[in-house]
Structures are given as C-alpha cells and as structure tokens.
Amino acid sequence: MKTPFAYATALSALVLTFASSAFAVTVPPGVTLAASQEITRQVPAETESLDPAHIESWTGNTIALDLFEGLTRIDAAGAVVPGVAQSWTRTAPDTWVFKLRHDARWSNGQPVTAADFIYAWQRVLDPKTGSKYTVLVEFVKNAKAILAGKAPLSSLGARAVDPYTLEVTTEVPAAFFPQLAAMPTMAPVNRDVVTRFGGEWTRPGNFVGNGPYTLADWQPNNRLVGAKSKTYWNASKVVITKVTYLPIENDETAMRMYQAGQFDYTYSIPSGIYAQVSKQFGPELKTGLQIATYYYSLNNEDPLFKDKRVRQALSMVLDRDLLTQRLTADGELPMYGLISKGTQGAAVFKPDWAGWPMAKRVDYARNLLKSAGYSDAKPLTFTLTYNTNDLHKKVALFATSEWRTKLGVTTKLENVEYKVLLKQRHDGKVQASRDGWFVDYNDAMSYFDLIRCNSVQNDQRYCNPQVDKIVDEANQQLDDAERTELLTKAHDTAMNDYPMVPLFQYSAVRLVKPYVGGYTSSNYVDQRATQDMYLIKH
C-alpha cells in the first residue's frame, strides 16, 4: 500500500492526530432524527463466537465492531480513524507508539489501558486459547516464535510504556498496521472478566466490552441485541440506541422480512434478480464492489488434489463470465486469482488461458485430467461441501454442471451449516469446499494468509516455500513499487500452482431503508459499525 511518508537517512516520526469530527457520526443540517433510534440488521449466519480470539467470519466481525473497539477503527467511508488510541506515531519502520485516550472505559466502568491490549494479543497466541485466527497478531514481533513454542508470551513485541502509551514493534515494516489494529482480533479483552467466567464470559450478564454497544441479549440462531453503552468514551455522538442482529441464511426470506418492515438493512439480496429488485426498490438497493473473493478451497493434501493438473483442469473449464453475468448477476467480477481488484500492494492475476475460446480451454483441461490418470472409464470423483445459502447452492450446481458436462467429473454436493463447514475446513475433513475472504485491511498481505505455509487460515494446506520467501523479501522493502512488484510475483507464483479455484469478486448488494442515514458506497472493506448510522424521521 502507499505509505504516507518517505524515509530519509534518519527516519522522522509521523504523528497522526484527529479532530473529534473525524470519528463521530455526522447528521447533516436539516435532518430530523426519528424518535426511536433502534435498528435491525441481517447477518447471513449465526456468529461462531463473541470472543475476539475466536472470531473469524464476516458475521462475527460485524457484530464485534459494535461490542469492542481497537486502537483504531474503520469509519463509514472506510477510512482509519482513532479508536481507543487518540493518536499514533511511527517512530521507525517497524515501531509504532499509540497514545490511548484516558476516558476509554469498559462497560463495567474500569479504564481501558495498554495492558488490556497486551493481554488480549498474548491470549490470542496462547495455545491454551486455541485461536484459529492468529494471523493478525502474527505481525507483532516474536508472535510467530511464540506460536511455534520457541519464545514465551512475554516476548511479544508490545510494551506498555505507561498505562496509556502502547509501543508496538512489528516483525516486518507494516505501513498498514493502523488498519490491522481496527480488527476485532486486535481488540482489548478484560482480563478480570475472562478469569472469572472462563468460556462463559461472552454470555449476557457476564459480558464486558469496550465498544459503543454492550451485549443486552443473545439467543443463538435467533437474535443478538446490543444496547448503547453508557461508558463508551464517545457515547454522546452515538445516535442509535439499540441494534438487533438476526441471523437469516436465506436471502429470499430476508427480503420478505425487509418488505414486511422486520429489517432496516439486509446482508444481501437473492442472486440473479438484481434488475427486478432495482426496479422494485430503486435507491433502497445499495451496490458496490468489495475487496473480497469468492472461491472454492481445494484440500491440497487430499490424494485427488495433490496433483496440480487436477486442480488446474477444474479451474480452467468454469465460465466465470457466464456465472457472474447470468447467475449471480449482482455486479460481481470474474476472478482467476485470489487477490481482488482494488487491493493495494499487488496486481490481480489473469492466466493466458482466460482469453482462450472455451473449446480450447476444455480440450486442454481434458488432456490434463487424462495425463493425471482419469478418463470416461475412470472419472474424477469428489465431494464439494458448501454452507447453507441460496447463492452458495446455485454456484455449486453451476460448477458441478460445468465439470460434469465438460470434463466428465462426478461431484457429490454436501450442504452443512456454516459453523460445521468452518470446523471441517480447519480440520482438513473436506475435499473441496465453498470459501470466501473479505480483507481485514486493504493490503495484499491480508490475502497471503490463505496460501502461506503453516498459516492457520490456510485451509488449502498449500505450501510453496518459494512463495513465502518472496513475500518475506517484499515485506522488508520500504519502497512501495518494489514491494508491490514482489508481492505480485509471489501471488502469480502461487496462483500458477492452482491451490484453489477463484470464482468472482464479491459485490456488496443489499437493501437499506431510506431512513437509515450514514450508509456510504465508498466502504470497500464493508466494515460498517452501527455507531456510524442514524435513523431519519419517517
């Protein structure tokens, strides 16, 4: 990504400070607010957890943006603004100093201090916690050594200079660290509450957070309710007093609920009916690309998918243009690589064969399978697992039809709940599976966690030491152009190994009531906190 300053012979410090208006919701002049400021939002699945150490999904992250606050946060426009830290200084390529605000409080009234962040990050890395999402904390110095059991937790590169000053040393220069610090995984956790309640600390009645909302109710698979926190440092600027999240997996059901007034804000719309919904709802339909990728994860340790020829053949015959124009048809872009358009730090990947006529692609792919030992008499057969959702089902049916008609491949479809799929992928219990990645921060490194050797998010179980070597070299560069060139090379190298089957770049297409203020189309990372919204009189 583009760094905000250049290094001379001696590095000069950059201090970032912000006016209060930069991180408060702004109600335009002349707008009359509704008497009731209670909003209901759809999430596409039940959250796997409310514990920052165990949150992995879009749902979990979205809810956690309301219940917790990191050193920084992402505002309505997608910009990095102060959170618990009121300012930060980059004193060296690998060193950041964050000045914490003295009025930051936990929902139980205790002050939020630098020690709370250190405890939370060490907890993510502690094997006893069993976190599956350590990739963000791994940017902090010595984190990887701690995970490998080669260094103690106390060696983590985070130091409390005083209760309200946190010094962070990163493993490599990371200009994007303030973006990364906004993610729920990097949020502080209250040690007293975790110690007292153990695994039950996130239950209503036990829960203590430091975000603009506190947990009022949580009925798994039914609803989760957040109530405006009286102790939040910026509470006077938070307009919405209550947010209710309903986990509805079926987009058609969600749209009916929206029409009935049960939702103010949906996660998505049913696939393939964009024109119809646009005509019916007009400006209530919000659209925009996301820096996010929809793909099929292939277990590279599975006997079938150890062979690159098999993986490449499956990718080559999928008509992504047909998929995105006729089936999903919500503004998605065809993708052949992992990194999506708009990502800073690397270019997108498009193989030469993407421009071939489909007949030529099919012929080449059939020869790949033949050389791998498959034929009409001995067809390639495997199971594709996807989680419950209309879109995922439609895409799976499309892909299996393409593979069957063009390659003679037999694919068994397996549908499971999201939590089940998440565990199966991590445990290596699936052959091929539906997957997707929404960047945590706008930099190519957010994607590389999926393909680096031994990464906990590498469900593909793919490993190419050459890719890791190039990535490590790239992250030592202080010149943006050189870093981008190397990360692009690393991405191209990995994608030419076909560890997965990228399909398309997600679009953010959802219905938002006209009285919901604060929703913008420029938030490409789609991190939308309720505190940035307000309800207009209607």
Spans of features found by a protein language model:
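Ligand/substrate-recognition segments at binding pockets and active sites
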Residues: 41, 220, 362, 366-439, ...
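Extracellular/periplasmic solute-recognition and catalytic clefts
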Residues: 216-227, 244-302, 325-326, 334
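Gly/Pro-rich hinge or "lid" segments in bacterial periplasmic/extracellular proteins
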Residues: 79, 149, 159, 163-164, ...
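Surface-exposed binding/hinge segments that line
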Residues: 89, 99, 118, 125, ...
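Extracytoplasmic/peripheral linker and loop segments enriched in polar/acidic and small residues
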Residues: 25-27, 32, 97, 159, ...
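Long beta-strand-rich cores associated with HINT superfamily self-processing modules
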Residues: 510-538
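N-terminal lobe/hinge region of extracytoplasmic solute-binding protein
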Residues: 42-93, 206-209
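Structural transition elements
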Residues: 333-371, 389-394
